[in-house]
A protein has these predicted regions:
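Bacterial N-terminal signal peptides
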Residues: 9-17
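Extracellular/surface recognition and adhesion modules
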Residues: 14, 43, 53, 76, ...
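Sec-dependent signal peptide cleavage junction
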Residues: 16-28
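Surface-exposed repetitive/solenoidal architectures
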Residues: 25-94, 169-172, 196, 218, ...
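Structural signature of tandem-repeat unit edges
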Residues: 46-56, 71-84, 94-107, 116-136, ...
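Consensus positions within tandem repeat domains that build extended binding/scaffold surfaces
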Residues: 87-89, 110-112, 167-169, 190-193, ...
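Extracellular modular ligand-binding repeats in secreted and cell-surface proteins
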Residues: 157, 161, 282-364
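Short, solvent-exposed alpha-helical surface patches in non-cytosolic proteins
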Residues: 376-388, 395-408
Length: 408
C-alpha cells in the first residue's frame, strides 16, 4: 500500500516501521535467550524490518555474528523484562538504524552493537538505572562513560564530563572523519574504541588523558597526525597497529612532553617506536563550546571553540545536522476503505512530537456480474453502488434486470 506523508518532517525521519503495525505481518520468529534463559526470550521480525525482542532474561551472545545479520533488520525494539544483551548479539546487522533499550536492560556485553554501520540512534527508557541516551549516543547513567556512539556519524563531539570512551565505542565506524574530545574530563580511551575508523585523519587527545587501550586506534588507515598529552602514562598492546597505510603511515606523533617523559610512558609494544616524534610541542587548550541554538529533531546546530594559548588563533567549528524524528509504528486512527483515506498517528521516540500519515484508499476488487458488460461506461459505477449498499444484484453473479443502462 503506497503511503503519503502529511508532515514534511516525516521525510527526514528514520521510521521504526514502514507500514502501520495493523498491516505488518511477521516473517520470522524464534528464541534468543542466553544460557539459562533459553526460550524465555523470544523475537519476531515483521515485514517492515522491525525486530521485537521480549520476555525475561538476557539476549544470547552472537557466534561469529548476530543471528539476525542475514535478515533485513532496520529497527530493534527490546521490551521491558529483557535484562541484558550478549557479546556480538547484533554484530553485522548492516541495515540496523535504530535500537531501543527498556528500563530493565542493565548490561551490554562487548561489541553487542558492533559493526552496524547504519546505526544512528540508540534510545533508552528514562527509567533505566544504568544507561541514558543523548543525541542518539549511549552513555552511562551519570554521563561519565560514552558506551556507544552512532556508527553512521561523520562528525562527533564528545560532551563535557565524559571521562572514558568505552571499549568498542566507535568500533568500525567507517564514516567517522572527525572526533572532538572534551577538555578537562577525559582520562581513558578504551580497548578497540576506534578500531577500523578508517576515515579518521587526525587525533588531538587533550591534557588529562592517561591511558589508551589495546587496539584503540588499530587499523585507522587514514590516520596521519596524532597529538598526545604529557599526562599520558600507559599505551596498551597494539593501540596503533596498522594505523595509517603501508605507503603513508602516521607522519607525526606530536608529544607535549620531553623525550625523557616519553620514555617513561609504559608502552606494551613498539608500534609507536618507529614513528617520527616531535617533542615539547605546544598542546592546544580549548575553551567551552559555543552553539548557535539547541540541536533537535528538526534543527541542526553550529558549534565553535577556540584555543586559549597565547598567539594561537585556531578555532574549531563543527556543524551538526538535525537529529531527525524516530517515528514509532503508529496508531491507526481511521482505516482506509474503497472511498476514504486512512490516517495513522505516529509519535517520535526522541521528542514525543506527533506526525500523521495518510493511507491511500483500498483498491477493492470489483465483483464480476455476468450480465454487466465490463466495457460499459457504467460498469465501475454499478460496482461502486453495489459495494456501498446503494443497490444489490440478484445474486453474486447477476445484477439484473437485464437491459442497457443509459445516461440520464
Amino acid at each position: 500500500m503506497r503511503k503519503k506523508l502529511l508532515s514534511i518532517l516525516l521525510v527526514l525521519s528514520l521510521m521504526l516501521a514502514l507500514v502501520p503495525a495493523a498491516f505488518a505481518a511477521d516473517i520470522a520468529s524464534g528464541t534468543c535467550g542466553a544460557e539459562g534463559d533459553g526460550s524465555n526470550v523470544t523475537w519476531t521480525l515483521d515485514e517492515t524490518g522491525l525486530l521485537t525482542i521480549s520476555g525475561t532474561g538476557k539476549i544470547a551472545s552472537g557466534t561469529g555474528g548476530s543471528i539476525w545479520s542475514d535478515k533485513p533488520v532496520l529497527a530493534v525494539d527490546i521490551r521491558s523484562g529483557v535484562t541484558g544483551v550478549g557479546k556480538d548479539a547484533f554484530y553485522g546487522c548492516d541495515d540496523l538504524q535504530v535500537i531501543s533499550l527498556p528500563d530493565t536492560v542493565t548490561q551490554l556485553d562487548d561489541n553487542a552493537l558492533g559493526n552496524c554501520p547504519a546505526l544512528s540512534d540508540i534510545l533508552v527508557d528514562a527509567k533505566n538505572p544504568a544507561y541514558k541516551s543523548v543525541d542518539g549516543a549511549l552513555y552511562s547513567k551519570d554521563g561519565t562513560v560514552l558506551v556507544k556512539g552512532p556508527a553512521n556519524a561523520e562528525t562527533f563531539v564528545v560532551p563535557d564530563g565524559v571521562a572514558t570512551i568505552g571499549d568498542y565505542a566507535f568500533f568500525g565506524a567507517k564514516y567517522l572523519t572527525s572526533i572532538y574530545f572534551p577538555e578537562g574530563s577525559l582520562t581513558t580511551i578504551g580497548a578497540m574504541a576506534f578500531e577500523f575508523c578508517e576515515g579518521l585523519t587526525e587525533l588531538l587527545l587533550p591534557a588529562g588523558v592517561t591511558e589508551i587501550g589495546m587496539y584503540a586506534f588499530a587499523h585507522c588507515s587514514g590516520l596521519r597526525s596524532v597529538d598526545l598529552p604529557v599526562s599520558l602514562k600507559h599505551v596498551s598492546d597494539m593501540a596503533f597497529l596498522s594505523a595509517g597505510t603501508m605507503d603513508a603511515g602516521i607522519a607525526d606523533i606530536n608529544y607535549a612532553g620531553s623525550e625523557q617523559q616519553w620514555n617513561a610512558i609504559a608502552f606494551e609494544d613498539g608500534v609507536l617506536g618507529w614513528m617520527h616524534k616531535n617533542f615539547n610541542t605546544e598542546q592546544h587548550t580549548f575553551g567551552a563550546w559555543v552553539t548557535d541554538g539547541t540541536r533537535s529533531c528538526a534543527q541542526g546546530v553550529t558549534m565553535a571553540r577556540s584555543c586559549g594559548n597565547d598567539g594561537c588563533d585556531l578555532v574549531q567549528t563543527v556543524e551538526l545536522p538535525a537529529l531527525g524524528h524516530i517515528w514509532d509504528s503508529g496508531t491507526l486512527l481511521a482505516a482506509p476503505d474503497g472511498v476514504r483515506c486512512g490516517i495513522v498517528e505516529h509519535t517520535c521516540g526522541r521528542c514525543n512530537g506527533t506526525g500523521y500519515e495518510v493511507l491511500d484508499p483500498e483498491i477493492w476488487a470489483y465483483e464480476q456480474f455476468g450480465d454487466v458488460d465490463p466495457t460499459l461506461w457504467s460498469y465501475e459505477g454499478i460496482q461502486f453502488c453495489v459495494m456501498m449498499g446503494f443497490m444489490s444484484g440478484m445474486d453474486t453473479h447477476v445484477f439484473a434486470p437485464r437491459g442497457v443502462t443509459t445516461r440520464a
